[in-house]
Amino acid sequence: MNTFDLLIDHLFFECRYHPWTVRNALDFFVESYSYKDQCSISFTHDMGSHYVFTPKGQSSYEIPYLTDCFSYMTQEQLCNWILAAAVYAYRTGNTVWLRSRKETLVECFQSMQKRDGLIPDGIMDVDSSRCEGGSEITTYDSLDVSLGQARRNSYIAMKCFASYLALGSMFEQLPMEEYQEQADSAADNCEEHMLAYFDRKKKRFPALFDGEGTMAIVPVIEGIIYPVFFGKPEAVSEDGKHGRLIRALKEHIQTVLVPGICLFEDGGFKLSETSDNSWISKIFLCQYIIEKVLHMNMPQVMDKADAAHWSWWMEE
């Protein structure tokens, strides 16, 4: 129930039509479904299942000692709370609520920094102690390591970048100038190190920033949707402060959206070069980002992809 992975995907619709549901979920996560590990605060994957709430601070999904499906999503759920809070606060103008969550925002920022590890490059290095020797996963847990592993993952790194921008935006509204400067600096640091992993020869980002996971993924772009919806579209503009990163992402998409890499034979999106598992909601989100945030005009790719995705739905 109230799976955070779904809340973040439904966020844009909910904030437009009934934003109070987002606020209630954010509050309930803080009050009953947050927890602290060796780093600091994070949030559970869900609040229970089959109409039964789980005990406080526990989900129905996450289990220790694992390295893939059913492990913890500590870093990603932390990002999800930050991003959802930023979008809700901006879309509603509810600064009263934002002020009531000042302490939570500071805790979230400190938690983000500690998960960065001993070498602060803005990219997640620390698996939660709740994993008990296992390792964290992402919402893409049913794919292979290219998207399933959270640590040093380019998809998670971009989400962390967006989360630092979100924290900077909320600290600016409060105002909390010192924290705003620190969050903005953390976003800059994250961008700089992500760009260092961009392969100039292959013209793409690797899935994992670990020197080994060189396969390509499409959702590396997913994080840049959020600044558009929390009032900082210039942060993800090709002509803005982070223009180098945006241009690199455009080059990445141009490179990987070809058959044999991140397109199936029928032209449908293949979220990972090395996994045949895809799902349509994430594909639609990436298509929107390509067309409306990156402003890429790719009619031949998109028209064929739309036809393929339609055929997937219509298959019996």
Which sequence ranges carry the predicted segments?
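Short beta-alpha connecting loops at secondary-structure transitions
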Residues: 66, 141-150
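Aromatic-rich carbohydrate-recognition surfaces in CAZymes
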Residues: 1-126, 133-136, 152-167
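Non-catalytic carbohydrate-binding regions of carbohydrate-active enzymes
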Residues: 111-121, 128-140, 174-218, 233-316
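Well-ordered alpha-helical scaffold segments within catalytic/enzyme domains
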Residues: 8-20, 80-97, 111, 159-177, ...
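Extended aliphatic helical segments
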Residues: 22, 30, 41, 52, ...
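Intrinsically disordered, low-complexity regions of eukaryotic proteins
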Residues: 7, 129, 143-146
